[in-house]
């Protein structure tokens, strides 16, 4: 949902999910991240009304949906948030093949597949794919876990604009 203005040395003004500088140059190369990169939700979609828009394809609005997928893949993205349609992804594969060749396309898609599958292997879903209903019932919705999650969310709140003078917080002021 974000565009990091003035950050990309190329001057491109695109959403971060379409930015090779953000995803590959910074996140992967500079900071060494090798996990899955999933786009913000719905940034490859077209929307006919603001009510249905959950993401925006900033900077690539003029591109087709398959072209947006292709641009995100070239940026280094592995997974498309909010997209359950394989069509644009397969078309992006064909675009990659046309530009860089079949070998390069396979290598690029396999790199993403490895990252995605590693998460499934690490959780043991291939070794033991069966759910233990008793254990699940004790875990899912566990009040202690829900409280810990809620507290983690409270600690992760970020103030983007300080228009109302919220910060610095006074010890005598309640928020």
Describe every region a protein language model picked out.
Residues 1-175:
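Glycoside hydrolase catalytic-domain context in secreted enzymes
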């Amino acid at each position: 949902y974000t565009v990091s203005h003035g950050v990309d040395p190329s001057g491109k003004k695109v959403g971060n999910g379409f930015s090779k500088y953000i995803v590959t140059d910074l996140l992967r190369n500079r900071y060494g991240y090798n996990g899955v990169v999933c786009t913000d939700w719905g940034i490859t979609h077209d929307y006919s009304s603001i009510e249905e828009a959950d993401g925006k394809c900033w900077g690539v609005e003029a591109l087709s949906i398959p072209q947006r997928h292709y641009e995100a893949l070239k940026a280094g993205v592995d997974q498309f948030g909010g997209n359950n349609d394989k069509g644009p992804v397969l078309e992006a594969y064909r675009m990659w093949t046309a530009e860089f060749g079949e070998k390069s396309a396979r290598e690029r898609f396999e790199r993403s597949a490895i990252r995605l599958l590693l998460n499934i292997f690490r959780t043991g879903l291939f070794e033991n794919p069966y759910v233990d209903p008793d254990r699940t019932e004790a875990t899912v919705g566990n009040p202690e876990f829900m409280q810990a999650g809620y507290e983690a969310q409270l600690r992760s709140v970020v103030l983007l604009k300080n228009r109302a003078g919220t910060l610095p917080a006074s010890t005598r002021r309640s928020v």
